[in-house]
Amino acid sequence: MSSAPPFAAALAWSGHLRRRLDAHPDLAAWLANACAHPVSANVLAAWQAELSGPDAPEVLPVEQCRGMLRKLRERVFLTLIVRDLGGQADLEEVVGAMTVLADIAVGTAYRSVAAELAAVHGLPREQSTGDPQEMLIVGMGKLGGRELNVSSDIDLVMLYGDEGETDGPRRISNHEFYGRLTRRMMPALSEVDADGQVFRTDLRLRPDGDAGPLAWSLDALEHYLIGQGREWERYAWLKARLMPAQAFADSNPDAQARQLESLRVPFVYRKYFDFDALAALRALRERIRQDWQRRALARNGVDSANNIKLGDGGIREIEFIVQLSQLIRGGRMPALQRRGLLEALHAERAAGLVPEGDAQKLEAAYRFLRRTEHALQYREDEQTHLLPADPAQRAALAAALGYEPAAFERTLAEHRAFVSQTFRNAFRLAGMGEEDDSPAPARTHANGHAMRPHAGALHDIEERLAGQIQRDFPEHAEDLLRRTETLLGSHRVRSLPDSSRHRLEALLPAALTAAAQTSAPMDAALRLFDLIETIAQRSAYLALLAEYPDTLARVARMVAASPWAAQYLTQHPLLLDSLIDWRTLFEPLDFAQVAHQLAADLDACRLPDGEPDIERQMNLMRDVQRQASFQLLAQNLEGELTVEKLADQLSALADLLLAETIRRVWPLVNRRPGAEPHLAVIAYGKLGGKELGYASDLDLVFLFDDDREDAAELYAKLGRRMTSWLSTMTSSGRLYEVDLRLRPDGDAGLLAVSLEAFEQYQRSHAWPWEHQALTRARYAAGDTEAGARFERIRADILVMPRDVQALRGEVLGMRDKISAGHPNRSELFDVKHDRGGMVDVEFVTQYLVLCHAATHRVLVNNLGNIALLRLAGEAGLIPAPLALAAGDAYRTLRRAQHQLRLKGVDKARVPPGQLAAERATVCELWQTVLQDGTIAQAEVK
């Protein structure tokens, strides 16, 4: 038995290693050589080939397969003991080697057993193609996450695609074939013989557990997950991975792999908030808390502190902390959909869900506990997680891990204390409430009585609501009673299952109470009832509002303040759960973080073959836009944002989404490897002027600066795909309406135009109104060099010499056309289109820019109407007091328009006396600049 330095730490700790070397002295030389190199996939493949023998057939007989796999497992285990305890192997090498071993073992056993069965029964075949049909072997838990410990069992689920039968002389059904195959595989992997075993194998995570068939068809799995799948099964399927096992030549399981992933992802990662799921996850956390205590009592009171997996602050708690955020938020943030724990933790840190310091501490604790776990298992090749109680053995463990006993105990205690505290606060960390030592929110009616678990029929709740309405809404009782009757009589409510109806009965009185406490009680009550009727079929949202009274109160305040906000929430109930964490909703939007996370999430939207999942990507971008807009809306309604700041934020959001759209669409149209898009997206109109509203269209022009031969066709195709990406209605709605009519030659022109052609058009063919529009244009997204070139062209066009009188006539004529196109036959003042309204200010500003930018270059800058008017006043182009007054008037008009939009008004009109002073100021500006016709000729002295 050698005592060479590489073996010293391992021999001192591992009785298993000592016994193997005593029994096989020649093993020491082999091991000394093997432990000099990392245990990689290539190393395992070489060992497998060596152990199989030089003349081995491509598919080993089952008995030969059994022996080879057990010897391979011993090589891996012994080499890892030496490398790990000698400080040569990190955690990634250890768990990676064990996972590769499992993949090899399962794949090899599958091929061997399948060949024996096929020789008797023939091959199972796909019904549609007739091709051989593989069994789909799914690795669950740590096997799925590629993080097996060194003495782990493996959890498998066996699936297959089509029903049907084999093609041999003794035909059996595919179902029976895969069942027999599974049954015969198990001894090859888990039976203990003279060479030991490969892996203990557990099939109980399949649907129905031990009571169910050994192998399930994908259709049966789908029915099970949809109809009976439980929350702990979501947790189990999170790491599920299709293993690389293929037994039949000419088979192609890609379609089945895609089908499996299309079942797994929406089952595990739900797009919509689900209170039932949250409650089940809370219960799962309590089970984790209590599981070891029960086991400890059954084992004569073993202290749970000795179990580094199930005890307080153990590995299982770290797994729950990380996977909780994945389960709650992974449906909307695909970047969190990682099977590996550390990968998921890193993704959560990058997404801002886990503070940097906490993430580092969790990772350090995980690495420490996993290494300790492996050391415990190296000792006697046992699946144990119990720290030795004997002080001498404990000191030996510390030494094996490179610690002094006191330092080991201190480090262990620090890690476990941090993990335990974080575990208790896991739901707060995931953004789902405060510290969880407090009881769950009480399920009460608005009158304070506890919600009856078996409430009466709908007429009972109607009677209770009637009394509440007459008490709290006496002036509007009749109208509200009528609305209550229609709500309770609607098909959506009548068809609710009992559980949802009970929630509705709890929610409606609470909604009336919340509405009564707002600034517009009747409006709030009616709008809340509209919202509730819309979401009635989604029990998760009923539960959310019923179980979180603070959230319901926030919704009530929002809908009371703005019918437009009420409509927005009704159309996009996905946003409701963002109201749970009110503080987060009022944090300023970090556009750099939004862009980073969006890119990561879009990158993660992949089909099983690695191609981008375009539908998921398009929906994700829409969901992100809705969430960000809703965050701004909440801040807007609480008075946190001015109209100007809000428009800046909405415009920045649109720019960000345009840039990401280019990145996602370009690979779909470009076939030249390595080519980058030289496209500049030019924003006109409201987006160009950074005056975007919640529901504004995007006025865009696509310009390119690329000399490749197919540039015109390529960028036209890119423009079409971008427009479709932005404006197509998907299950998540439409991102933006897009208007491309401001491009050269309008609808008759090319969809994308070269910068040279754009410049030539602007110099020689553009109408004056197109130069007016150019004053508000800006580079918004795309190639920065092309964007800079556009800005230079724009500046050159704006400073061109012009016939002032002719320009004045054109501007007046265009203003008349706009008035004719927006007739106002009411007595109200249209704050945008009527004389003295916003359009007059915009036209005056554009006229001043086109007249004077050549001599006052500062006017070239796209600074917005208010800033440009002020600069014109400072330059003496208009009276400075009038410039400031007109800017203030324009700001007031915009604010009035915005408030009316929030009230759901289609046309922003007010009584004629309401904005009389502002209207008079704008009329004076118009008269001074365009009617008198003198300001354009000379500067004001």
Swiss-Prot record:
It comes from Bordetella parapertussis (strain 12822 / ATCC BAA-587 / NCTC 13253). It comes from the Bacteria. Pfam families: GlnD_UR_UTase, GlnE. SUPFAM superfamilies: Nucleotidyltransferase (SSF81301), Nucleotidyltransferase substrate binding subunit/domain (SSF81593). Its cofactor is Mg(2+). Belongs to the GlnE family. This is Bifunctional glutamine synthetase adenylyltransferase/adenylyl-removing enzyme. Coiled coil: none annotated. NCBIfam families: PRK11072.1. HAMAP family: GlnE. Involved in the regulation of glutamine synthetase GlnA, a key enzyme in the process to assimilate ammonia. When cellular nitrogen levels are high, the C-terminal adenylyl transferase (AT) inactivates GlnA by covalent transfer of an adenylyl group from ATP to specific tyrosine residue of GlnA, thus reducing its activity. Conversely, when nitrogen levels are low, the N-terminal adenylyl removase (AR) activates GlnA by removing the adenylyl group by phosphorolysis, increasing its activity. One of its GO terms (biological process) is regulation of glutamine family amino acid metabolic process.
